[in-house]
Amino acid sequence: MITNFDSHTQELNEYEEKILQPIVIKGLSTKIGKSKAITNKKICEVLTSKDYEITDTRLRKIIHNIRANDLLPLLIATSRGYYVSNDEEEIRDYIKSLSERINSINFIKQSIQRQYNNRPNENQTNLEL
């Protein structure tokens, strides 16, 4: 779970793991190549039209679980949506994009730490996270 995002990042519940996740895996396994990409919004629309309960944030958590547990190898995402890639350049670009996002988040973390540590307060303690 991620602090301050508890309801969005909590572990999958039984319904999500046993019912939704297999459906999502089955659907995404047909999305081979960028031209077959499907957006989070579209996946949620399809599932809710079939009376499944899903939110965009919980779908992202399901997809996180699928990736983290190697349930559908090389499932990547772009602004076009999610798809399985067998293209080496796409996979390298996706890994590079993830690294750039990590660096961006770390930069903001360091900026917030610096701002906190530099605030005018005599009784403050410095943050070293």
Regions found by a protein language model. Give the residues of each.
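Short, amphipathic alpha-helical interaction segments positioned at domain boundaries
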Residues: 89-112
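Short helix-coil junctions and helix-kink-helix linkers
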Residues: 42-54
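Minor-groove-contacting beta-hairpin "wing" of winged helix-turn-helix DNA-binding domains
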Residues: 78-86
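Exposed, interaction-prone assembly regions rather than primary DNA-binding/catalytic cores
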Residues: 112-129
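Short capping segments at the starts of secondary-structure elements
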Residues: 28-39
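A short, conserved structural fragment
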Residues: 67-77
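Short alpha-helical segments that sit at the start of domains
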Residues: 1-30
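Short amphipathic alpha-helical interaction segments
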Residues: 53-68
